[in-house]
């Protein structure tokens, strides 16, 4: 298994000479939500439906770039819409894996909002009751957040798995990605966290630097998942068969 530094250096090498095209593609991808919101009435709905598909298409295009293929700035459109249904199917399956912490978080938020609303509408504010309710709601939200973190990182590479083999069912893709992440979630979390300094710089530059940081981060994460899934050594098929046999 390569170290984080080695993965990042490999990503830099793979992007060498193609950073401009990669940055331009991320720029086009980034302005799409804004353009959709300009469409009266249906814009926000269209954005919610299409954006996850374009996100998948962006990842698929960067996998192609990593493999040395020639890519176009708008390739993420065709790559995304080619697997429109599967992209949504995988996204929904991942959300369903998070149903319990999501439900707890919604209940916690509802408790806090209810306490504030009741206190404001009654006119006679009972600070002790409101405070207890707010604390209970806040604790529920915190528990839900902490609970969701390991689940999120278990299935965070489900879209990568889809990009490598879209012929399988959504549930098989999600479960397979989760099995590859067994014993690797902490490494995946630390890898993501290691980019935090870059994103501080992205904020300082009002997002402009992000057009170069996002390709760097995506390719690094692609390399990481390829290593844990055996694809770096072209052993993904054999490893997948091993996983299914163990079931």
Region annotations inferred by a language model:
Residues 1-247:
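Hydrophobic alpha-helical membrane segments
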